Amino acid sequence: MTEVFIYDHVRTPRGRGKKDGALHEVPSVRLAAKTLEAIRDRNGLDTTTVDDIIMGCVDPVMDAGAVIPKAAAFEAGYSTRAPGMQISRFCASGLDAVNFGAGKIAQGADDIVIAGGVESMSRVGLGMSGGAWFMDPSVNFPAYFMPQGVSADLIATKYGFSRTDLDAYAVESQKRAGHAWAQGWFDKSVVPVKDQNGLTILDKDEHMRPGTDMQALASLNPSFQMPGEMGGFEAVGIQAHPEIERINYVHHAGNSSGIVDGAGVVLLGSKAGGESMGLKPRARIKAFANIGSDPALMLTGPVDVTEKLLTRTGMRLADIDLFELNEAFAAVVLRYMQAFDIDHDRINVNGGAIAMGHPLGATGAMILGTVLDELERRDLNTALVTLCIGAGMGTATVIERV
C-alpha cells in the first residue's frame, strides 16, 4: 500500500448561517473556489497534476448542487483536466472526502488529491435535500428516527448529563475558541473571503461568543422539548430505550453547534506526487474507519467507530495525543469523554462547533486541519479525528506527523 501524506490544508472563516451573516451573499461554489485557489497558490500546484477533487456537501441542491468541486475548480482557474466528485455522509462528509482520497492514493490510483467540503447553510437550509429518513415512514418508523436534537437529549438522559454539565462544556468551548483566535493559532490556515474588488468580507469565525457565561446560557429555553413532547418523538425514543422513563430536555442554542457557512480542503498525496512538486509532508494518514450505530441515540457513532479503529490498528487510547470531535451537541462530546475516560485537556483543545459553528459538509476537513496545526504547535505526534453522523453512524481518522 502507498503511504498517504497530508501536505497542507486551508479553510474559510465560518460565517453565521443566516441572511444577515457575512457569507450569505457568497454561493457555495465560490466558498469552495476560495479554498482551491488558496491551496494551489500556497503550494505552487500545477493543477494539471491534480488527480481528483473530492468535496462533501450535505445538502447538494439549488446553488449547492451539480458537483460543486468541478464547478469550483473552474471558478478557481484550475486546469480542465482536474475532475471533481461530490459526496455526502451527512456531518462526516468532509472527513470522508479526505478518507476517500486517501484510499485512492493508497491503492495507487492517484498521486495528488484535494479533499474537503463546503456548506452554505444560510443559502441552502438544513434538510433541504429531503430524503427517506425525513419523509418515508417505511424507513424512519422501524429505525426510531428522530430529530438530532431529541437524540442528543436522549443521550444526555441515558448517560446522566445535566444541563449544568452541558452548559459548562459550552462555556469552555467558547473560551478555548476565543483564546485560540486571540493567540493567532488559526491564522496560518484560515483564508479570508474577499469580494470581487478585493475587499475582505470575513476573516474570522463569526459565530463565536467568547464572553458567554453560565448565567447567559441559563436564560435560554430548551430547543427540542416541543418536537419531543408535542411531535411525539419522546415516545419514539422511550420505545427504543425503555430503560428511560422520560427525556430531560437540556440542549439549547448555546450548547449545540452553530449553523454557519464555510469551506475547507486538505491537500493529499503520495510521496512521489509530493516530491514531483517540491512539497514537504506534514503528516500521514495512518488509518480510518466507518461504522453504523444505534439510530435512535444516533450521535454515539464516534464511540463505536473509535473502538473499531483502535481494534483494527492495535492502537491504544494512550497512543493518541489529541482528539477532535465535532461538537454537534455538548452531550456528544461528554459521552465520548465518559466512554473512554478522556481528560478535557486532550479533546477539542481550541474549541469546537458550539463556539465556531458546524458547516456540515466542511467540518470534517476543518477539524482535521485544526488538530494538525495543534500537533505541530505543541510538538506532539498523533491525533484522532471523529464525527457523529445523522441516522446513526460514525467516521474516524488517525493522523501522525512525519
Role assignments for model-derived ranges:
Residues 87-118, 156-186, 265-272, 359-380, ...:
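Active-site-proximal alpha-helical scaffold in enzymes
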Residues 27, 57-111, 131, 143-150, ...:
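Conserved catalytic cysteine-centered active-site region
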Residues 10-13, 24-34, 42-44, 168-271, ...:
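N-terminal extracellular/periplasmic Venus flytrap/periplasmic-binding protein-like
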Residues 28-44, 68-72, 97, 149-155, ...:
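Short, well-ordered amphipathic alpha-helical segments that serve as non-catalytic structural scaffolds
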Residues 22-113, 117-134, 138, 190-204, ...:
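Conserved beta-ketoacyl condensing-enzyme motif
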Residues 271-319, 337:
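Glycine- and Gly-Pro-enriched alpha-helical subdomains that act as flexible
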Residues 9-12, 16-19, 102-159, 226-229, ...:
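Glycine-rich loop/linker segments at domain edges
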